[in-house]
Amino acid sequence: MNLIPRTSIVVYLKHMKHERQIRKYGHIVHSNRDRKFVIMYVNEQDVDQIVHKLMQLKYVRHIDGSPYKYLKKTYEKEKHEIYN
């Protein structure tokens, strides 16, 4: 079984009724009706094409990418000095 690298994107919508049409572009993980956004996973190799297609839709306000792959994932134990 091969794992396909995926990344998350946040899609801000004008109306949440369009959430169903967004489903065909990726896997929706979370949606917030108050703030009108959807968090979805898409294949990493197809991100540019999917973002381009989503931006052409009239009910999409803007799209943010996930900063996860740029975050530091390994942490070293910090040494704290104790002052008396």
From Swiss-Prot:
Domain of life: Bacteria
Pfam families on file: DUF2129
InterPro entries membership: DUF2129
GO cellular component, one term: cytoplasm
Cell compartment(s), UniProt: Cytoplasm
Main location (coarse class): cytoplasm
UniProtKB keywords: Cytoplasm
Family: Belongs to the UPF0298 family.
HAMAP family per UniProt: UPF0298 (MF_01126)
Annotated protein name in UniProt: UPF0298 protein SAOUHSC_01072
Organism whose genome encodes this protein: Staphylococcus aureus (strain NCTC 8325 / PS 47)
